[in-house]
Amino acid sequence: MAYNAQFDLNFLFWFLRPFALVDVLKKPRFLDALTVYRDRRDYPHKLCNAIEAYGLTDAVNSHRAVDDARATVQLLEAMAAERDDLAQYIDLFGTHPKYGISGRKISSVTYHPQPYQRTVPLYELL
């Protein structure tokens, strides 16, 4: 799980590529908290906005890996308490409706344009 998982997976892809280990990215399951948050709240969609929107006063958004990981866990806990549908988002990444994804696609992930207007959850658009 990560906030904007596609961004992190791009780093992993390019790190693993010289060692011919890219296939390890096919095995795990992925949960992108950004995709879930986009379905729950209006723009802006930065992690700091999500922390504020859910009133996570203990969460720290310092752009440091450990702080951001802890904040993402707290955010996912809050979103799970709000609506019990996080399992529907596993291996589903919302993409920018105009620009698509950045970087390499992960073969085990379903990518789908995620509209700005929140009418139905992304998983219902598939």
Question: Which residue ranges define each predicted feature?
Answer:
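DEDD superfamily 3′-5′ metal-dependent exonuclease/proofreading module
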Residues: A2-L126
